[in-house]
Amino acid sequence: LTDLDALIALVRRAGELALSFYGRVVPSEKPDRSFVTEADKAVEEFLRSELGKHFPGVEVLGEEVERGVEKSVAWVVDPIDGTANFVAGVPIWAVCVGLVEEGTPTLGAVYYPAFGELYAAQQGKGAWLNGNPIHARTDDDIRRDDLLGLSTLSVKRMQVQLPCKIRSLGTAVACFTFVAKGSFIGGILTDNRVWDIAAGWVIAKEAGAEVVQLRTGEPMTKLPLTRESLPHLLVAPPQFIPRIREGVRL
């Protein structure tokens, strides 16, 4: 088994565990008023344990356990990205695991168990959906029926003056995976942490998309292994980035 094969198998098992809770959880509120469930905690515990067995010595930074990391290589885990969807019975939620080395995501897997899509990527090797290669859009025309993904807070804060349609799916990683497979022309993300980004980042990059800071257009070259909030980000194929940045009012 390669590291990527092992990661895919782990994320699939974690997704099945999450699915066993789906439709029967009672959420509690975190200090920031966002939801957390017994499923989030159980999935993160499972991933911490299994990653520790398969990749001994590599630290884990996760959303639900308030513990930092000390080295420059770590697994970054979001046990359920889209907890509000999960609680409400909306099937757009995912288990996300990425490996960050010296600030760069190098391996990633994202699994949507409720509809069976598993995305994976390895730096320099490509990106796949359920084992088939995927690629972001390569044309340069933004059409009326094209889709631009916005995170929940982006929708509340931004005006979009582009001919396309807007989709806010309630999970940050969807902006990355749906850009990677060519479903979205881009995705705009605000108020995210590294665990929202790491796995999706390598998938989108390997599929031909770029990740830039929305305000400046500067490439986002490194991800911090901290719990800090990240700047507003845009993920999109390079040919769409100038148009999208021009068409979005912060």
Predicted regions, residues:
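N-terminal subdomain of lithium-sensitive/metallo-dependent phosphomonoesterases centered on the IMPase/IPPase/PAP
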Residues: 1-80
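Residue-level signal for inorganic ion chemistry
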Residues: 18, 40, 51, 83, ...
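Generic detector of well-ordered alpha-helical packing
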Residues: 41, 64, 79-82, 113, ...
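Short loop/edge segments at beta-strand edges and connector loops
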Residues: 62-64, 131, 170, 215
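DPxDG-like acidic metal-binding loop motif
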Residues: 70-132
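An extended, acidic
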Residues: 137-250
